[in-house]
Structures are given as structure tokens and as C-alpha cells.
């Protein structure tokens, strides 16, 4: 359901409430004969409340971390499915990157990513999503709140093919804080042992033998290691990622066709 339809629903609700006391008796009569709301009605109300922020604080850099970690304890899910025109991508979220995991799940719960789109496609590198030039993402960011995320980088999570990570600004960001909305999935390319050794030396990184083997056999983008927080990995649907990555782009790496994505979270693989 798009934003305009939600707005119509809420406007109708507010108009009804604004009728005042003269209709109180009629409303009471209606209430007396009401049946219990159906599961569909309850689900719709929950989606409207989540999208419009009813009962949720507006997030800032001051309150976001505590709120998201607390929310994540009560709303923990381990998997996210990204539904696209080419098929589904299933991602596993890492439990030991709790803030980024909770943030992603919360934005899904608030309907930010339904729909959203992949807005940058860079061959042999990444596909990036979470923002667009359309009005809805800007409206939703205003409703949810503008904030960043303290980085949670871990040596064991690197940018091999299929890694899910958050984007970040490289300007005035010495602590490498993450965006709380923009994400990317790594496609990458195969990395030779010599090239990986150079990256280790340049970035003062020591890869495990397994990480070296994965970079050599399936590829990735190792120069992003130590720069962005990886918080999940594609476990199904990399062929779908490859189809999205093959989309023609303009000179700014924007796909020439809309690559819409809708997201759902769940506790097990469906």
C-alpha cells in the first residue's frame, strides 16, 4: 500500500474524530453492535501505525542506539527476504552486529523498504539501495528520524561476494559511522593472492586462510574492509543479485530502469 493511500486512511480517521460531541450517541450505538476486528483489519492498523510513527519516537543520534537495541530484543528476526522483479534474495543477519541488525529490521518494520529500490549498480563491485529521488523515502526519513549508526566492524566479516553492509559518508566521518538507511550487496570480482597481499599491507589487515580462499575463489571487494560495517550475507538468490547488477546504467551508475525491492523479515527460511 503506497503512502497516498495511507494518508487517505489517516485523513478519514481524523475527519471522523473531528465531528465532535454531537455524534457521540450514534458512535456509542455503533460500538455496542461492533464485532471483533478481523486479523486483516488489525494487520492494516499495525502497518499504518508503523509507517506513520504512531507510538514510536523520532530517532536522532542521541536516542537511536538505545531505542534500536531495546526494540531488537523484542523483535528479533534472523532473515530478510528482498522481493524483486527478477526473484527473491534471502539474507541472513548476524546476531553479533546487534545495532545494525536491529536498525535494518526496524526500518523494514516501519515500511521504509516497501517499496524502495536499488539506485546504484556498479559492475563487479556492489548494488546499492535504500534511497531514491522519489518523495516517499524523504517523507519516511522525516517520519522515522535522521540518524547514523556507530560502526560495528568485525574482522571475521569481510566484503566477500554476497556480503550485506551499510553505506557511509567519507566526509567529516572519522569514526566511520554508518548510514541508517542506505545499504549495499557485494558482487565483486575474484582477487588474486598478490593483490590481496598488497591490500593487507596497505590497510594493515590480516586475513584468515579461509577469507583469502573465498576472495580468490568467489571474489569480493576487499578494499572496503575496515571501512564499512558488514552485518549480513546473502544465502539464497545471488543469481538474482547478478541479474540486478547486469542492469544497464547511465553515466552516474543509476539503472535506466526502476529496480524496485520490497522486504519482509522472518525467523526462519521459508
Predicted regions and their residues:
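Bacterial N-terminal signal peptides that target proteins for export
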Residues: 1-7
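Bacterial N-terminal signal peptides
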Residues: 7-15
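Cyclophilin-like peptidyl-prolyl cis-trans isomerases
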Residues: 19-270
Amino acid at each position: 500500500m503506497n503512502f497516498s493511500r495511507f494518508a487517505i486512511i489517516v485523513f478519514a480517521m481524523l475527519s471522523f474524530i473531528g465531528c465532535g460531541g454531537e455524534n457521540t450517541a450514534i458512535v456509542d450505538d455503533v460500538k455496542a453492535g461492533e464485532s471483533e476486528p478481523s486479523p486483516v483489519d488489525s494487520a492494516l492498523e499495525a502497518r499504518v501505525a508503523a509507517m506513520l510513527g504512531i507510538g514510536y519516537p523520532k530517532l536522532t543520534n542521541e536516542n537511536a542506539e538505545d531505542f534500536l537495541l531495546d526494540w531488537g530484543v523484542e523483535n528479533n528476526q534472523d532473515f530478510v527476504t528482498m522481493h524483486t522483479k527478477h526473484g527473491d534474495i534471502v539474507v541472513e543477519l548476524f546476531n553479533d552486529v546487534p545495532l545494525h541488525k536491529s536498525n535494518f529490521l526496524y526500518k523494514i518494520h516501519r515500511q521504509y523498504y516497501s517499496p524502495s529500490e536499488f539506485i546504484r549498480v556498479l559492475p563487479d563491485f556492489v548494488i546499492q539501495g535504500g534511497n531514491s529521488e522519489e518523495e516517499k523515502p524523504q517523507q519516511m526519513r522525516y517520519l522515522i528520524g535522521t540518524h547514523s549508526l556507530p560502526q560495528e566492524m568485525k574482522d571475521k566479516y569481510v566484503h566477500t561476494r554476497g556480503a550485506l553492509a551499510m553505506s557511509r559518508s567519507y566526509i567529516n566521518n572519522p569514526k566511520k559511522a554508518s548510514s541508517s538507511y542506505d545499504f549495499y550487496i557485494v558482487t565483486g570480482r575474484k582477487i588474486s593472492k598478490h593483490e590481496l597481499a598488497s591490500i593487507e599491507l596497505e590497510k594493515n589487515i590480516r586475513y584468515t586462510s579461509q577469507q583469502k580462499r573465498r576472495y580468490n575463489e568467489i571474489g569480493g571487494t576487499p578494499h572496503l574492509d575496515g571501512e564499512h560495517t558488514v552485518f549480513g550475507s546473502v544465502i539464497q538468490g545471488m543469481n538474482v543479485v547478478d541479474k540486478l547488477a547486469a542492469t544497464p546504467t547511465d553515466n552516474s551508475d543509476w539503472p535506466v530502469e526502476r529496480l524496485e525491492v520490497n522486504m519482509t523479515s522472518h525467523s526462519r527460511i521459508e
